Amino acid sequence: MTLSVIPVLPPELRPLVPLDGGRFACSDLNVLYERVIYRNNRVKRFLALEAPEVMLNNEKRLLQEACDALFDNGHRDRPLTGSGGQPLKSLTDTVSGKRGRLRKDVLGKRVDYSGRSVIVGDPGLSLHQCGLPTKMCLELFKPFLIRKLLQRHYAANARAAKHMVERTRKPDPILWDLLEEVMSDQLVLLNRAPTLHRLSIQAFEAIRVEGNAITLHPLVCSAFNADFDGDQMAVHLPLSAEAQAEARALLLSTRNLRSPSSGDPSISLSQDIVLGLFYLTQDRPGRKSAGRVFADASEAMHALDAGVIDLHTRIVVRIPDQRLYEALGSGKARPKHKRIETTVGRLMFNDALPERLRFKNYAMTKDHLKLLVVECLQVCGTEVTAQVADRLKTLGFHYATRSGISFAISDIEVPPAKHEILASADAEVEEVEQTYRAGMITGEERYRQLIEVWTRATEAISTKLEAALDPWGSLATIIKSGATKAKFQQIRQLSGIRGLMANPSGDIIPVPVKGNYLEGLKVWELFIAASGARKGFMDRSLNTARSGYLTRKLVEVGLEVWITAEDCGTTQGLLMTHEESKSMGLPSMRGRLLGRVLAEPLTEVGLERGTLLSEEVVDCLPATDITAVCVRSPLTCQAPYGICQRCYGIDLATGNLVRRGTAVGVIAAQSIGEPGTQLTMRTFHSGGIANAQGDITLGLPRVEELFEVRTPKHRATMSEIDGVVVIERDEATGVQCVRVISREERCGAYPPPPDNSAHDEVCEERTYSLPSGHKLLVEHGQVISAGTPLVAGTLDPRNLLSTLGRDAAARYLVSEVQRVYHSTGVYLHDKHIEVIVRQMLRFVTARDVGDTSLLPGEIVDRFTVEAINARVLAEGGAPALVQPVLFGLTQAAMQTRSWIAAASFQDTSRVLAWAAIRGELDTIEGFKERLVVGRRIPTSG
């Protein structure tokens, strides 16, 4: 195929910009077009002159190279470069990549009516409010102000009205009243980059504030992952009435109090609020006038105002007929004669709670407050929870100020016994060293004993330090409340001993840092102590880019998954067991069951098939002996496109059954990717510590390995059949082998049965050569099942797929990803991982095509194959036989039905070329392709 005409972009897309001094800055495309024109003219001239064939061929080659450079300069062996030595950007470069036409201009657009500024906290705001600077308000709401000025006849025409708004030196006072009126019913969207999940964009009612900073409610910081150390946020104004209504219904901050990833509260009572509430609810012994009896709470408040008692005085008071909680989870007993022993501070705290949550008669730490918000969401709903959170915020800030709690260097002191403890530890270390030099212990034993000596010494110093600390002092109050990340370990490092440190590989260094920050550290101690911090900084920097790329791939895979039907009618389900949940690091299977739909009835508790497992239902299960529950899952959903409501279950962000049109694939991708930067980059090595599996890959690299289905570095050999283990050693090579023989009682390798029927049966056998240095996990004569690992290591999901099938591979991927997240303290619902794994296992390959139109080895969507087989069977033909295929994220994203979506992901030029060659048709059904052509996306929110 020969091109006789090449496309020329409009001048607006390859501008020529005049510079000072008569020079011009032009687009690289102009240079490439110029080269094509110049060489094309040379070929024309040589043809007219009837030049020799050799010269013509050379000129044609140069013309071909110029055309190649114009279309795709980056993939040439020697790309054409500009004056700075950088390759010139060709037509392909303008379309592909992060700054290409698709990702920069089509899928991501800049918008008008937006602003950006630094954020600061404002304790006076309500949860649904934010503060915008006056200058920003005037600019954002300028069209609305101009309309009001014209309607009220304050300006003769639009030009005069615009001048009134833009006159910032001496603004007309009437503007402020009109601005308040305009802003009263308008919501603005606040966005903090990076926008890792849906809670990074929320709607607020804007109020006008002085200064240049945006003011933010302190409780929404955790949802935005924001703090007030210089963070910036963007403001966007929805213009139409429909956009305002949608923002109020879906994005308002008081309607987004649950995390979509886990269902936990997205608002967080923290820091000063926690400190103030803990101080308010403390019960300090020995206070003045303790034991007084009051008729009701108001009488106790009068006594507080008169100075007869204080906040922490233990008193007896009558309360209404309410449930009494003396401690967290202590039951719902009602006090006798409605009299309780409490403090005035606790009366004030409970006065801020709804009646259904009273009476909390214990000190409120950060963990207690988090559970209180969870209970409030369950019992009272989002609107009441937002009001309660605002009241607790005000109360906490007030009493954090009233408490006068502060922290000074004089609050800590070095325990006198420290030097004696260290001297004793040094003597023990010398004994261990002498024993080692005498050859009586090994290096590993020496290492272990040194660690034990210094661990005991550190604990002894900690005990002395804790005994000397005032239990009611400022420092102890800060630690007990949980207001900060500081625990007693940090106090020990301040005035006791820093202790043992770990090197960047994760191994404990057997030489401790004996100093503390109060006395000061030696140079070498500071260097050792800082090694962990250096590792943390490097991990965070490397994690950010890798985590962002992982999130992008997850989103690409999940884009095609949304709720498309009410019920797919499947009878299949996923079995959840208590043992499996414990292996993932969970205390029970409650969190995994929450929000699911039963696939099989639970006759023990009278639950029918199809029952929605709400919090009330799930909380009843621990009282029974049920250890396994079969539930509907995205993995077993039979909807040919998307997922049905019953297989997905509850939308964790709302607590209700998921709505049709919800983009559950994008929500799943955001839920998995958002905590990605919290995962470590570390690979732990054995280094003297016994470890059966050798090096263990954890954190983000392990998550990437699982989602990309890479072969593990230390892959465990697994049995492909059921049978009996026979361990042998090859005498010639010395290599240890494991033979797995099925139906051992009928095989010739064992004594045959009396009827000699062994010779009539075919014995299946597999032989595995074991790699040296790997720990054997099976014994001679042991009966094992298919999929059992023979040596220590990491299982390969593709081996599981070929040996045990699709369900086993899917369960393994879900459990392994969850194990990584749970190890870092991140809770994530299984259904999000199941949605992504469903897409990874969506395809099959044709093994026997039968009477279908498929090709051998062709990769097809499994639901498409089921439809083809059903049609062929109805016609009396032979169906196709297929086997499942497990794709990594990158491969799965490229297998999308839409070539527009695939081209905007990566390999743009290759995807577009293949689509053109095959004449592919895009039906414009998904999110990205609809955005590209300007249609509405197929989701309800």
Model-derived features: positions:
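Extended, highly charged clamp/arch subdomains and adjacent linkers
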Residues: M1-S200, E205-A206, A352-K360, C644-C647
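Core structural elements
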Residues: T2-P18, V36-R39, K60-G74, S83-G100, ...
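Short His/Asp/Glu-rich catalytic/ion-coordination signatures at enzyme active sites or charged loops
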Residues: P15-V17, G21-G22, R45-A48, G404-A438, ...
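Flexible, glycine/threonine-enriched loop-and-boundary segments that flank and lead into catalytic domains
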Residues: L3, V8, L102, R198-I207, ...
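Conserved catalytic core of nucleotide polymerization and phosphodiester-bond processing enzymes
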Residues: V209-L216, C221-G230, L237-E242, A247-R248, ...
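Intrinsically disordered, low-complexity regulatory segments
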Residues: R101-R103, I146-L149, A160-V165, R169-D172, ...
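Amphipathic alpha-helical/coiled-coil segments positioned at domain termini
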Residues: E12-D20, C26-S27, K109, Y113-L127, ...
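Gly/Pro-rich turn-and-neighbor structural signature
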Residues: D177-P194, E444-R498
